[in-house]
């Protein structure tokens, strides 16, 4: 049993997952949690909050991890921030479960607020794929992740280490820019260079639609997207509830899912998993479960949603953040669990 997440909190959702891991009879029980969880609880920076409830949940999280180790599971922390607060920007963003010959990959973290959001994981039953992803998990476990790609019958898997992402993402960005019939994307946080590539397709007359939540926990992204739409011809449709799904459908023939938000942080710094699927039956299933409901529930933007100034400042701020992250070195990759 191999478990990897960026967020793993000591609330009802996280404790339920931890209990299942602790009770498992698997001989190999390993858990990777990003150092994000030692700094952010319930979307609140621990160093910046005086909220007693958040502090209590943090203590419950540390106790949960201690109990996991006491139950015989192994636990390590990815990308520890250490003494450099700027290292926080480089995260291991992967979400993965490997259980014998079955794997799940996608966007789901283990916390109540994440469980409350619309989200998805792709379940794959295949020994070869499970073995390959277990190998990638082990690279992260050893603190030696590498950029890697592999093709199976109808799925291409990409494992990104946060250092060589520009090369790894190049085929996906080219696929967005070169789309011929349509692009549909569900994501709360898409930005350049992915959105810029989609805009290239839109400039050629290809219909490009992005479904993104109106109640976004990062509203600057919504402002950026609305500003881009005015300048590029992208269609932005707002969903009534928060979604954490990361999915793209290109020309109705290629389904892209995984942990990547299709954003500059993913492109620049995050360790990620991305799957590109050509299986027609699975694409039809995702069309019915994801894209058709998004089309039905979403609404066109309204005049009050748009602000030239908000769009300008959002784009400027995100570009500045990209420059900052580009100048950061790669932090230490792995550490044994210990309380903050």
Where are these regions (language model features)?
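Structural motif
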Residues: 2-6, 104, 184-189, 214, 256
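Redox- and metal-dependent alpha/beta enzyme cores, enriched for Fe-S-associated oxidoreductases
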Residues: 196-197
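Long, C-terminal catalytic modules of enzymes
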Residues: 253-255, 260-340
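Helical hairpin unit composed of two closely spaced alpha helices linked by a short loop
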Residues: 200-201, 206
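An exposure/low-complexity boundary signal
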Residues: 150-192, 301-340
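HKD-type phospholipase D/PLD-like phosphodiesterase module
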Residues: 7-178, 211-254, 260-267, 271-275
């Amino acid at each position: 049993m191999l478990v990897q997440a960026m967020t793993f909190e000591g609330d009802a959702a996280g404790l339920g997952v931890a209990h299942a891991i602790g009770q498992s009879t698997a001989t190999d029980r390993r858990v990777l949690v990003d150092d994000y969880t030692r700094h952010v609880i319930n979307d609140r920076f621990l160093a910046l909050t005086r909220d007693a409830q958040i502090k209590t949940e943090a203590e419950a999280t540390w106790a949960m991890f201690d109990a996991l180790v006491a139950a015989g599971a192994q636990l390590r922390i990815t990308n520890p921030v250490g003494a450099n607060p700027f290292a926080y920007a480089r995260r291991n963003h992967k979400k993965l479960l490997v259980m014998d010959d079955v794997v799940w990959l996608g966007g789901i973290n283990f916390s109540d607020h994440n469980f409350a959001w619309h989200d998805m994981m792709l379940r794959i039953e295949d020994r070869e794929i499970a073995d390959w992803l277990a190998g990638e998990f082990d690279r992260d476990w050893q603190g030696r992740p590498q950029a890697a790609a592999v093709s199976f019958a109808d799925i291409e898997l990409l494992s990104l280490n946060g250092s060589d992402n520009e090369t790894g993402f190049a085929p996906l960005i080219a696929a967005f820019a070169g789309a011929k019939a349509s692009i549909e994307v569900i994501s709360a946080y898409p930005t350049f260079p992915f959105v810029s590539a989609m805009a290239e397709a839109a400039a050629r007359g290809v219909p490009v639609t992005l479904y993104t939540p109106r109640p976004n926990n990062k509203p600057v992204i919504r402002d950026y997207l609305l500003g881009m739409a005015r300048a590029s011809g992208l269609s932005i449709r707002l969903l009534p509830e928060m979604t954490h799904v990361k999915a793209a459908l290109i020309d109705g023939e290629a389904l892209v899912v995984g942990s990547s938000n299709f954003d500059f942080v993913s492109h620049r710094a995050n360790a990620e998993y991305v799957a590109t699927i050509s299986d027609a039956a699975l694409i039809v299933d995702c069309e019915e479960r994801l894209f058709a409901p998004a089309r039905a529930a979403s609404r066109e933007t309204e005049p009050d949603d748009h602000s030239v100034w908000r769009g300008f400042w959002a784009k400027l701020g995100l570009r500045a953040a990209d420059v900052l992250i580009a100048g950061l070195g790669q932090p230490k990759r792995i550490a044994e669990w210990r309380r903050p």
